[in-house]
UniProtKB/Swiss-Prot annotation:
Self-association state and partner proteins as the record states: Part of the 30S ribosomal subunit.
Lineage, highest ranks first: Bacteria, Bacillati, Bacillota, Clostridia, Eubacteriales
One GO-annotated biological process of the protein: translation
Biological role: One of the primary rRNA binding proteins, it binds specifically to the 5'-end of 16S ribosomal RNA.
One term under GO cellular component: cytosolic small ribosomal subunit
Family matches, as Pfam families: Ribosomal_S17
Keyword field: Ribonucleoprotein, Ribosomal protein, RNA-binding, rRNA-binding
Cited HAMAP family: Ribosomal_uS17_B (MF_01345_B)
Family from the record: Belongs to the universal ribosomal protein uS17 family.
CDD domains: Ribosomal_uS17
UniProt keyword Plastid, yes or no: no
Name of the protein described by the UniProt record: Small ribosomal subunit protein uS17
Alphabetized InterPro entries for the sequence: NA-bd_OB-fold, Ribosomal_uS17, Ribosomal_uS17_bact/chlr, Ribosomal_uS17_CS
GO molecular function: rRNA binding; structural constituent of ribosome
Amino acid sequence: MTENRANRKIRIGTVSSDKMDKTITVSVETVKQHPLYKKTIKTSKKYKAHDENNEAKTGDIVKIMETRPLSKDKRWRLVEIVQKAKTLQ
């Protein structure tokens, strides 16, 4: 029997914290339009995502996917690192 995984939500965001073990905090920005005044508003939401190998670092742009509950706050997991953060050396 094959599982249908096509309906899982995927988000792209920036890693804002990697200080926890196997967990990253990803900030996802969305642009919405106010229903009455039609002004575009930028909103952001933070998700805690599972990072099994501690690959992602602060500032990286990552893709996360919805998954089963892994802890009290974690319902997302890291799929891939889209772009590494630029470091000054």
